[in-house]
């Protein structure tokens, strides 16, 4: 029997959930979840993550929080009835934005009531306060939706159990390349019930602004945060150049990035003109190295003949596995390649690649199983199927390895580019 309420148990959802979670994990080379102890267990929980990588943000949050969670998504995705039904099945509610017009915004009142009911029944609700995605290590202005939902819930049952907003930071190794890394960090929760009492005001608008300020602060502390202004590109490029020598856990990498950015900001305050000039130079360097097809990672180590020779041997050694992977996963990466060319918003490309993987797991996988056991002895069939499992991500990993390998060779023939990078780093250290 289908569930009547979005937060109720559903057998189909429970069967699909572990399959989705497994595919999400396999879509990243490394994954990490930190701060789960910060999720309260004594009240209603609203999760508030940053929004930088379209649907993948919701998927990594879903996998990171094993508890059943209801999500909010932009309302225009629900315009088609079939899509709306699928969204309901996936526990996703429509969230109307101000840009959708006042008449539509009023519909949020109905959604708000469902959110409050969901929270009252102990099911977490996840909403992206920024309202729209932006592939950048920064934050946009937080919308009012998350605070209105929290205040409505607090008004209804805050006297029985507290309402919390948990800030969440999502960090990716790359926004656009498939099979990178993902880090989810839960921060210290804001006890909205206690926060409202401390304000001693009754006007909702007066409550929202302090909450917005506090949540923005806590969210920015959970990611590699850079103010999104004209110096953003220069600061991010400089941060990457200075962090190349550090190879730690995902959490340590993020903390190291934050330390470097803090140092950059301090130097900017002391010597604004010199730092402005350096950041402009860093932004120019980034454009030049991209134009020459040189990866930022090629600057991490000296590109000696020995290093290139070893990489050549590695590429040749892995080539048979790559050919097998390319053939075995051809229907998947072929469709993915077509979709990635069609999609204009680069931030959606990883979502498309994941979608193909998930669809392949549910369709192409069973077909391969049926064919393998139809034409091969069972032990050969099992062996072949086990070999096929990692082929999709390995195909992308090998392509990335070759991309960086070619980049290393290009850099070895571009000493001026290496000198350009060294000049930026040395200048920074003297400021």
Language model region names:
Residues 269, 277-294, 302, 324, ...:
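Terminal low-complexity segments of carbohydrate-biosynthetic enzymes
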Residues 6-203, 321-431:
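Soluble catalytic domains of membrane acyltransferases
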Residues 201, 241-242, 312-313, 317:
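Short, charged, low-complexity loops and linkers
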Residues 213-298:
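Long, charge-rich alpha-helical interaction segments
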Residues 297-329:
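Transmembrane alpha-helical segments and their cytosolic interface motifs
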């Amino acid at each position: 029997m289908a569930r009547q309420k979005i937060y109720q148990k559903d057998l189909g959802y429970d069967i699909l959930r572990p399959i989705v979670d497994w595919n999400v994990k396999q879509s990243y080379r490394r994954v990490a979840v930190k701060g789960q102890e910060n999720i309260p267990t004594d009240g209603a929980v609203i999760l508030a993550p940053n929004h930088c990588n379209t649907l993948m943000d919701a998927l990594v949050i879903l996998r990171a929080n094993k508890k059943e969670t209801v999500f909010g998504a932009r309302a225009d995705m629900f315009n088609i009835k079939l899509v709306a039904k699928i969204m309901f099945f996936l526990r996703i509610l429509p969230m109307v934005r101000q840009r959708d017009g006042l008449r539509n915004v009023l519909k949020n009142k109905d959604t708000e009531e469902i959110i409050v009911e969901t929270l009252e029944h102990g099911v977490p609700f996840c909403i992206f306060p920024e309202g729209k995605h932006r592939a950048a290590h920064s934050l946009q202005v937080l919308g009012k939706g998350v605070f209105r939902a929290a205040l409505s819930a607090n008004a209804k049952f805050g006297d029985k159990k507290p309402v919390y907003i948990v800030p969440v930071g999502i960090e990716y190794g790359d926004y656009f390349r498939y099979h990178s890394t993902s880090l989810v960090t839960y921060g210290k929760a804001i006890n909205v019930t206690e926060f409202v009492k401390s304000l001693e005001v009754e006007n909702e608008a007066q409550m929202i602004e302090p909450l917005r300020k506090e949540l923005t602060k806590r969210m920015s502390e959970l990611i590699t945060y850079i103010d999104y202004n004209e110096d953003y590109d220069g600061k991010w490029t400089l941060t990457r150049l200075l962090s190349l020598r550090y190879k730690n856990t995902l959490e340590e990498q993020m903390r190291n990035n934050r330390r470097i950015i803090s140092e950059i900001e301090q130097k900017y305050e002391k010597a604004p003109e010199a730092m402005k000039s350096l950041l402009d130079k860093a932004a120019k360097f980034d454009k030049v190295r991209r134009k020459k097809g040189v990866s930022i990672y090629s600057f991490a180590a000296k590109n000696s003949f020995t290093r290139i020779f070893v990489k050549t041997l590695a590429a040749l050694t892995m080539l048979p596995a790559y050919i097998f992977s390319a053939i075995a996963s051809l229907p998947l990466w072929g469709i993915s390649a077509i979709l990635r060319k069609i999609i204009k918003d680069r931030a959606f490309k990883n979502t498309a690649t994941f979608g193909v993987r998930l669809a392949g797991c549910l369709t192409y996988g069973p077909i391969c199983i049926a064919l393998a056991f139809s034409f091969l002895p069972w032990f050969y069939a099992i062996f072949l199927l086990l070999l096929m499992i990692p082929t999709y991500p390995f195909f992308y990993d090998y392509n990335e390895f070759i991309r960086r390998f070619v980049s290393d060779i290009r850099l070895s023939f571009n000493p001026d580019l290496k000198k350009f990078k060294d000049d930026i780093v040395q200048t920074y250290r003297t400021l």
